[in-house]
Structure formats: C-alpha cells, structure tokens
Curated annotation (Swiss-Prot):
Function (record text): May have hydrolase activity.
EC number: 3.-.-.-
Organism lineage: Eukaryota, Amoebozoa, Evosea, Eumycetozoa, Dictyostelia
Record SUPFAM superfamilies: FAH
Keywords recorded for this protein, A-Z: Calcium, Hydrolase, Magnesium, Metal-binding
The encoding gene: fahd2
Name under which the protein is recorded: Fumarylacetoacetate hydrolase domain-containing protein 2 homolog
UniProt entry tagged with the keyword Protein biosynthesis: no
The organism's place on the tree of life at top rank: Eukaryota
Binding positions (a divalent metal cation): E141, E143, D172
Amino acid sequence: MNRANFGLIKLVTYIPNVGEQSKRLGALLENSIIDLCSADKSIPNDMRSFLSLNSTDKWSKVINVINNINNRRIPIENCKIKAPIEPGKIICIGLNYKEHANEAKMAIPKEPIVFSKFDNAICGPNDSIIKPVESDEVDYEVELVVVIGKQAKNVSESDALQYVAGYTVGNDVSARDWQLRKNNSQWLLGKTFDTFAPIGPSIVINPEVAALSDDTYFDPNNLSIKCTLNGQVVQNSTTKEFIFNIQTVVSYLSKLFTLNPGDIIFTGTPSGVGFIRKPNPIFLKSGDVIKCEIEELGSLVNNVK
C-alpha cells in the first residue's frame, strides 16, 4: 500500500457550494477539501458505501488522490460540512467513565451498558440542536464515536481495532426528564429526539487499517476530551479513563450482534454533565453554543435552537 505524505486521513461529507443539495465525499486538508469521486471515479460518493467496499486498495486510492498535487482543492469556506456519515446502527455505551458513574451515584458497571439512538437524531457541524417542547431538561455529553469499517462478528479484543475504520466527535444530547423520570425512565426516549446525535466534523481514519506511517499513530484510548458551553469548560477528561476501552466495547458488541460498515458507537461521556451539578443543574437553552473537542479528532460546534 502506498504511504501518505500528509499525516492522518480525514474524510468528510460536504456540499460544495451554497444552494446545492447533493452531498459529496471528500478528503479534508488544512483549509481545503479534495472531492474523492471527481478525482477517482471508482471511489463511491457516499461515506457508508465507501466504507462498505471489500476492496483492499480503497485506502491506497484515497492516499493517491490526496498525494496528487494536481487534484483540485476546494476552499473549505466554499463548502458546507455535513454529518460525516449516515450511519447504520447508532449504538451507545452508558456510564463508561468512572468519574461520571460516581457523580451520577451509580455503580461501576461490570459489563458495558448498551442503548441506542435512531437516525433522526443525526446532525452535523454547525447544525442547530433543536430543543424539543416536550423537554425542559436537555443536557450535553461529549463522546468519542467509533466508526465501524468492516463486518465484525465474534471478534477478539486483540483484533477489534482492525474492524474500526476511524473515529469522530459526538455529542450524546439527552433529555434527562424523559431518560430518568417520564414514561418509566426509558433511556431510548430521552436520547433520540431529532438532532440529539451531532457528529463530526470528519472521520479520522484509523492509521492501522490505512497502513499509514508510524508517526501518524495515536491511541484512541488516551485522548484528551473536552466540552465547553458558551465558552466555559464543563467537561474535561481523557479517554484513558474509559472503564471499557474501545477494543473491549467492539469485541463485546460483536458477540451480541453483527457490526456492519457504517455502524457507529458512542463510547460514553466523562464527568461534568449538566443535570448532576449542585446546587444549580445546567440545562441547554435557546442560543447556547456547545463545543465538543477531542485530541486528534477536532472540534464539533453546535448551537441550541
């Protein structure tokens, strides 16, 4: 496989010009985007379709496109960045940081706590999080999101990262009144209102599966993770504090059901969520701006409407 000379691969879904509606698959550089399908017609123009390719040379094709200086770069200011993927399954892990479990006064789980969201919850960078009229207790949760790149069933922890295409930033927005009190405290109902799963801005490709150079390697289980609300830091931790690391989560889930390319996994949030704060809990209101940041993966910014 050809080696990249540019560092990490960051793939985005974008609309190239204001007024257009068709989404495109691109490679994100510092201040520009390369349209992958325009440069190589064999590359699908959709993230999930691309990840579903069985071809072993799909990463080489992307690397070749990015390395070719003759390929047109589109200034990022001329593009609208969308959610990087329209996922298959949206799987979520609850209480996966010890400090978060402690602040919630819940027992440290012995196995991953699993719930889900529906695809109506997905939105992208700079999209508005819509505060539903049915909830007065909407909360934030910065999370690292795993993107599956290869069908996984009964995989071992030692092999699990080979099934991970990459990672992105997510916000597991939660209506605490529905999650914890209303209608028998159903987590699903509290987690899957429209726009309650912002993700982005890009999928940072797992260097192991793309055979990138050693200097691009990063450990997804040891990244700083932070959330700011209106400029004030409300969550600040590291994925080193995972109770169940990414290998454990992927392996565990694959033994329960098949993971397919394009499935995504929210891996849990650190301490600092709004509803637990004493004496004054914090809930999102119209006009708030939330910034979720993860080392190596970038920043995801959304406003509340």
